[in-house]
Amino acid sequence: MSKEGLPTPKDVSGKGLRVAVVTATWNAEICDQLHRRALETAEAAGAIVTPLRVVGALELPVVVQAAARTHDAVVALGCVVRGGTPHFDYVCDSVTQGLTRIALDESTPVANGVLTVNDYEQAVDRAGFADSAEDKGAEAMQAALETVHTLRTLDESNLK
């Protein structure tokens, strides 16, 4: 798996930031690892974290929206593995559109860390295990924290 194009993470402080991590429970081994890595990244940055769980990916948007109203950022995590029916496409499209709409409607960063993979092996390779090529839980948290700082920079520049 290529990491080509992956941006270098900025050293951002999460001090004083309230961040929710909303994680689905389907594909528990993968989702638990994504959740753990997001929490570790937030705590290392000094953020105040609210961990939340939902059953599946389709339940993410409604809880993410509620969290977006009371937090500085939200990270949505889950794992959808392609099966033999179009259900995969419906779930992935609905979740992606829902999370994007929430971020725009609430003006709150929502990092989409929902893995959409062809097989379980691809999920393991992205979940941030010791032998994984990628760490999508940590990357989603990093993106959320950086986006909060970018929005605050915009707010400050509008005050001048």
Curated annotation (Swiss-Prot):
Active site per database record: 87 (proton donor)
Record-level GO BP terms: riboflavin biosynthetic process
Source organism of the structure: Corynebacterium aurimucosum (strain ATCC 700975 / DSM 44827 / CIP 107346 / CN-1)
Cellular component, GO, one term: riboflavin synthase complex
Domain of life: Bacteria
GO molecular function per UniProt: 6,7-dimethyl-8-ribityllumazine synthase activity
Function noted in UniProt: Catalyzes the formation of 6,7-dimethyl-8-ribityllumazine by condensation of 5-amino-6-(D-ribitylamino)uracil with 3,4-dihydroxy-2-butanone 4-phosphate. This is the penultimate step in the biosynthesis of riboflavin.
Catalytic activity: (2S)-2-hydroxy-3-oxobutyl phosphate + 5-amino-6-(D-ribitylamino)uracil = 6,7-dimethyl-8-(1-D-ribityl)lumazine + phosphate + 2 H2O + H(+)
Family: Belongs to the DMRL synthase family.
Pathway, per record: Cofactor biosynthesis; riboflavin biosynthesis; riboflavin from 2-hydroxy-3-oxobutyl phosphate and 5-amino-6-(D-ribitylamino)uracil: step 1/2
Taxonomic path: Bacteria, Bacillati, Actinomycetota, Actinomycetes, Mycobacteriales
Binding residues for (2S)-2-hydroxy-3-oxobutyl phosphate: 84-85, 126
Amino acids binding 5-amino-6-(D-ribitylamino)uracil: 26, 57-59, 79-81, 112
Transmembrane stretches, start-end: none
Alphabetized InterPro entries for the sequence: LS, LS/RS, LS/RS_sf
Key words of the record: Riboflavin biosynthesis, Transferase
Name listed for the protein in its UniProt record: 6,7-dimethyl-8-ribityllumazine synthase
Enzyme Commission identifier(s): 2.5.1.78
